UniProtKB/Swiss-Prot annotation:
GO annotation (BP), single: L-histidine biosynthetic process
Protein name: Imidazoleglycerol-phosphate dehydratase
Catalytic activity: D-erythro-1-(imidazol-4-yl)glycerol 3-phosphate = 3-(imidazol-4-yl)-2-oxopropyl phosphate + H2O
Places the protein is found: Cytoplasm
Transmembrane segment boundaries: none
Organism (species): Dictyoglomus thermophilum (strain ATCC 35947 / DSM 3960 / H-6-12)
Family: Belongs to the imidazoleglycerol-phosphate dehydratase family.
Keywords annotated in UniProt: Amino-acid biosynthesis, Cytoplasm, Histidine biosynthesis, Lyase
EC number(s) recorded for this UniProt protein: 4.2.1.19
Predominant localisation class: cytoplasm
Domain of life of the native organism: Bacteria
Coiled-coil positions: none
Lineage, highest ranks first: Bacteria, Pseudomonadati, Dictyoglomota, Dictyoglomia, Dictyoglomales
GO cellular component: cytoplasm
């Protein structure tokens, strides 16, 4: 079973995540920021992951700490679970949501890198970047996001999480042989 349970506790936050990569796309638990609960549950639904989360933090100060630490914890859980099998590794998805159009490309490579092409600076100053950076660095994957069009911030961010979920669901599929010219990822 490709499962992991990771707990992270700091003076600012507490995050515990149980992840099953071979699930049904269910999201259970408590996340005190409704918009980000919506985005994270969307990611898990489209990836086909079962996730149980318990998170709390000093959101009265700023939600930044909890959002970033949730990305870190989910990334660590993903990394721990994915290493229990061989997997497809690469995927890309282009997803529309009304006027928004987003392309996501992933490589579960063992080399963390995040690139967001956002010519209109739609995501400037948005905490979604902190979540994604924490997730990418701790899952040790390469993630490229291109915002091809969009005006409504909610549509753009939701399209990102849908595309990311679909791409990760495909890239994390079990295969008999992991493809790498090096012979291994990590």
């Amino acid at each position: 079973m490709r499962r992991a349970e990771i707990e992270r506790e700091t003076k600012e936050t507490y995050v515990k995540i149980a992840l099953n990569l071979d699930g049904e796309g269910s999201f259970l638990g408590d996340f005190p920021i409704p918009y980000y609960k919506h985005l994270i549950s969307t990611l898990c639904f489209y990836a086909g992951w079962d996730v149980e989360i318990n998170a709390k933090g000093d959101i009265e100060v700023d939600p930044h700490h909890l959002i970033e630490d949730t990305g870190i914890t989910l990334g660590k859980a993903f990394n721990s679970a994915i290493l229990k099998s061989s997997f497809l590794r690469f995927s890309n998805k282009v997803i529309p949501m009304d006027e928004a159009l987003v392309m996501v490309v992933v490589d579960i490579s063992g080399r963390p890198y995040l690139e967001i092409k956002d010519d209109k600076e739609i995501l400037k100053g948005r905490l979604i970047k902190e979540f994604l950076r924490g997730f990418v660095n701790n899952s040790q994957m390469t993630l490229h996001i291109w915002i091809l069009s969009g005006e409504n911030l909610h549509h753009v961010e939701e399209a990102i999480f849908k595309a990311l979920g679909l791409a990760l669901g495909e890239a994390s599929k079990e295969v008999s042989n992991l493809k790498s010219t090096k012979g291994k990822i990590w």
